[in-house]
């Protein structure tokens, strides 16, 4: 990749992730450069955080992988769609709507997207 295209990718990511918490943008740039799936969790958590209210952000920050997206974080289907679209753009993956229905917890989301980022079949 040329220097100009690297700058363009970084500018695009910076715009996409502008309201995400610190570290999200940097993880996305690193992921795009080397496709290392270890960055996926930081990216996904940052994108989810961006779409939450302040009290929900605290719940997310102090929880484990069993935290439920809808029940515990109060996410609705529109918010989930916004999260999915931003994750797809950032990670350059496609998320199947049928598989999306099975993602209930933060752990489900992280495992699914980490597998997608590695080019593996996601867990069912």
Features from the language model and the residues they span:
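Phosphopantetheinylated carrier protein domains
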Residues: 80-103, 123
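Thiotemplate assembly-line natural product biosynthesis machinery
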Residues: 4-61, 119-124
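Short alpha-helical elements of helix-turn-helix
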Residues: 42, 78-81
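Short, cationic-aromatic polyanion-contact patches
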Residues: 104-114
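Hydrophobic recognition helices of helix-based DNA-binding modules
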Residues: 91, 113-117
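Generic structural marker for isolated residues within well-ordered, non-membrane alpha-helices
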Residues: 45, 66, 84
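Glycine-rich loop motifs involved in handling phospho/adenylate chemistry
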Residues: 32, 60-76, 96-105
